[in-house]
From Swiss-Prot:
InterPro entries: YbaB-like_sf, YbaB/EbfC. Disulfide bonds: none annotated. It is found in: Cytoplasm, Nucleoid. GO terms for cellular component: bacterial nucleoid; cytosol. This is Nucleoid-associated protein Bcer98_0019. Transmembrane segments: none annotated. Belongs to the YbaB/EbfC family. Homodimer.
Length: 109
């Protein structure tokens, strides 16, 4: 009886190590994936990766109006929030495969 228990424990440890490697690989791949957030009908675009890091900000020339800096700030903010929301969704979809069935507090993956 003890022997079977130890075998099960070893199998469980191997499965956990395998899952840990898969999670590390998925995390690494998240950093390579990119999402795009936009605002103003594409006037401002923000690129982020799956780690929620902003990689690039692009804006069309016509959106840059020295008389209305506030509008540009609002568009950059909206595009950034859109990109970060998409990065969060990507992260949840990618890492969620490892945590489904576990009752973990929100925001961990």
């Amino acid at each position: 009886m003890m022997r079977g228990g130890m075998g099960n424990m070893n199998n469980m440890m191997k499965q956990m190590q395998k899952m840990q490697k898969q999670m590390a690989k998925a995390q690494e791949e998240l950093g390579e994936k990119q999402v795009e957030g936009t605002a103003g009908g594409g006037m401002v675009t923000v690129i982020a990766n799956g780690h929620k890091q902003i990689l690039d900000v692009k804006m069309k020339e016509e959106v840059v109006d020295p008389e209305d800096i506030e509008m540009l700030q609002d568009l950059v903010l909206a595009a950034t929030n859109d990109a970060l929301k998409k990065a969060e969704e990507l992260s949840n979809a990618t890492m969620g495969q490892f945590t489904k069935g576990l009752n973990l507090p929100g925001g961990l993956f």
